[in-house]
Amino acid sequence: MSRVLVPCHVKGSVALQVGDVRTSQGRPGVLVIDVTFPSVAPFELQEITFKNYYTAFLSIRVRQYTSAHTPAKWVTCLRDYCLMPDPHSEEGAQEYVSLFKHQMLCDMARISELRLILRQPSPLWLSFTVEELQIYQQGPKSPSVTFPKWLSHPVPCEQPALLREGLPDPSRVSSEVQQMWALTEMIRASHTSARIGRFDVDGCYDLNLLSYT
């Protein structure tokens, strides 16, 4: 299935503080990144790709357009998706990730805004985010191909049987061929291999056929 890159604007991340902000132990454990689509009408999201950078868990909320008279509402479509099996180790910390619409918890149609919620509970990493974020929608469908009627509607199995009625019986043809072969062998066996001389007639020479030099 084809896909088309959707132009978007990724806003700066907003950190939500974990712990006492008045002490050195307070640190951002949650980041919120909003993505808008100022030049695109509400669309059906097909795929999200990005490169992880030490984010342990990802949640996604989408804002879906309903109508001009109803305000768009936020819906959670992905909740605590694991990007690092162990937040305290390097595994998965810098992997490329692709998320498809069939993995989402809700319908991904009429999307007007996207919100990424990043979590990293481990104190080992100084910073975390996602990079190279790209949003895709479904591309135009391929034009339908028209097949000939004889190809799209196969001939029923009964019709070839009717066509065979006009053909000779294979066993009869085989028998006649064998008879012709036997007759040919008989003629070949009875044919003399003696050479006939140019002027030899019944073992004698015909004087009228001889030429004088």
Swiss-Prot record:
Q: Which cysteines are joined by disulfide bonds?
A: none
Query: Which domain of life, per UniProt?
Result: Eukaryota
Q: In which tissues is it expressed?
A: High expression level is found in brain, testis, liver and kidney. Weak expression in spleen, leukocytes, small intestine and colon.
Quote the subcellular location field of this record: Nucleus
Task: Keyword check for Nucleus, yes or no.
Answer: yes
Report one GO cellular component.
microtubule
**What keywords sit in the KW lines?**
Microtubule, Nucleus
Q: How does it assemble?
A: Part of the neuronal tubulin polyglutamylase complex which contains TPGS1, TPGS2, TTLL1, LRRC49 and NICN1.
Protein name in the entry: Nicolin-1
Gene it is expressed from: NICN1
